[in-house]
Amino acid sequence: MMRMFRYTNTLQRTAKISHVLWARNYAKDVRFGPEVRAMMLQGVDVLADAVAVTMGPKGRNVIIEQSWGSPKITKDGVTVAKSIALKDKFQNIGAKLVQDVANNTNEEAGDGTTTATVLARAIAKEGFEKISRGASPVEIRRGVMLAIETVKDNLRRLSRPVNTPEEICQVATISANGDKSVGNLISEAIKKVGRDGVITVKDGKTLCDELEVIEGMKFDRGYISPYFINTSKGAKVEFQDALLLFCEKKIKSAPSIVPALELANAQRKPLVIIAEDLEAEALSTLVVNRLKVGLQVCAVKAPGFGDNRKENLMDMAVATGGIVFGDEANMVRLEDIKMSDFGRVGEVVVSKDDTMLLKGKGQKAEVEKRVEGLREAIKESTSSYEKEKMQERLARLSSGVALLRVGGSSDVEVSEKKDRVIDALNATRAAVEEGIVPGGGTALLRCIQKLNDLKGANEDQNMGIEIIRRALRMPCLTIAKNAGVDGAMVVAKVEILDGDYGYDALKGEYGNMIERGIIDPTKVVRTAISDAAGVASLLTTAEAVVTELPLEEAAAAGAAAGLGALGGMGMGGMGM
């Protein structure tokens, strides 16, 4: 005969109360193993699918809703990746990790974000599958990184330098989605300002793209205080026909800059102060004059450090016809400033991160003398760091600034085209830096043969190598699929071909990719595979994921538990 037992009232109440305490203390959602990996992979898939449709010459556009203004239409992989946020937190973590791959590739190489995203998805997917069958995640990652080093070495061997304007034009055209006019524009800009010159992309005001070369200097220091901003077209300071005050030392007191402010105000000209730094007293004087009096003034920290900062200030002074205060060779005190001591420029644009001085009024003979001195110093220098810094200064002094104004019939069209122009410009710079390889995913397919001969220390490492071998086929396969053909057949055919031969997706033909102008910058391909493998292989080693518990869910759980406890206490009081 079965006996039935009943909890005592005290035990019932204790059980209910402990449940209430547990629910109230529970603030994080923790999940483990295959379940959470599958959810992250779903997020990776959503992001990769959205980005992959833009790949190749026949890739499609993506329309992104914006919180303000018209929707954005783009074919830029990193813009699409950045726009994606998923409701499910575990899926969103997977998406965000691949988003980081796209961002890192974009920052380092300026292009190749779609390739990096497609590769990251392939590596993560294969990695999860192998781990679910019992392979060691750590050993798989080691195998993946071993394969990546072999791929990077092979890409360097395949690479060839970019020398002619025609090759530069080809690289830019491919990155601009086959837009020859953009390729020509960038090639022309590089020809005008040189490979080390500064090229800036802006919104145009006409239907056509325009190239304007302005003699000027740009450096990576912005305004010290946002109170200097004087335009509603973004967080910028814009002045026309401005005076420049250069100071090598820190400006400590307000009285030391008052004479300069009075001179500028008397001439009704804007004043830009470029100094090592400004202490609080001097800075507050400028800000108060800007806000209360309406004085057109802005303060910027001088670029560089130590001797390099001093030389940068001297370059600017020569280019604009001013002097540098605080310099040992110049004994004039800041308080004794005269109008002839100011530098002069036709236009100044200062953002949060950089400053552009355009149309400097310095004497050409003095500028040429300074340029020649720099060239001699570069030849004599034995330090690669010093050479690099002097090369940057030479570019600013001699080359000027090229402005690419992107035209179009609407803001949406200009925005879409501007994304492509920036991509093309970044890709071109990367190509000039490290050379080019055959495009269309061909270079990565040529690395597969090298991996066939590579062996890891154990079977799990060999699985990691196999994951990369399979992933290398994905860019070519995705380009072919977007062109409406069988991707697997195209990949199989290209693998049989030799050297530079690959698939021209635009024409639907096989041929020599270099001769057809279908090329990728080596740096872009190398960065894409390296970043994708690094993040995706780390993703596969994850065993647990912790997220915040949604507030409404936590509150509901607490309320339900509270009601249950009250009910339990009531029944206990009734003697049940």
From Swiss-Prot:
Boundaries of the annotated transit peptide in chain numbering: 1-61
Major subcellular location class: mitochondrion
Disruption phenotype annotation: Flies are male and female sterile; reduction in numbers of primary and secondary spermatocytes.
Tree of life domain: Eukaryota
Molecular-function GO terms, alphabetical: ATP binding; ATP hydrolysis activity; ATP-dependent protein folding chaperone; protein-folding chaperone binding
One matching Pfam family: Cpn60_TCP1
Keyword Nucleotide-binding carried by entry: yes
Entries under Gene3D superfamilies matching the protein: GroEL, GroEL-like equatorial domain, TCP-1-like chaperonin intermediate domain
GO term, biological process aspect, one: protein folding
Tissue: First detectable expression is seen in the posterior part of the dorsal tracheal trunk at stage 14-15, which marks the beginning of terminal tracheation. In the larval gut, expression in proventriculus is stronger than in midgut and hindgut. Malpighian tubules shows low expression and late third instar larval imaginal disks and brain showed moderate expression. In larval ovary and testis, expression is strong in the posterior region.
Keywords: ATP-binding, Chaperone, Developmental protein, Differentiation, Mitochondrion, Nucleotide-binding, Oogenesis, Spermatogenesis, Transit peptide
Keyword hit for ATP-binding: yes
GO cellular component term of the entry, any: mitochondrial matrix
Compartments (UniProt record): Mitochondrion matrix
Family in the record: Belongs to the chaperonin (HSP60) family.
Function comment: Prevents misfolding and promotes the refolding and proper assembly of unfolded polypeptides generated under stress conditions. Essential for proper development of trachea, spermatogonia and spermatocytes.
Stated name of the protein: 60 kDa heat shock protein homolog 2, mitochondrial
Gene: Hsp60C
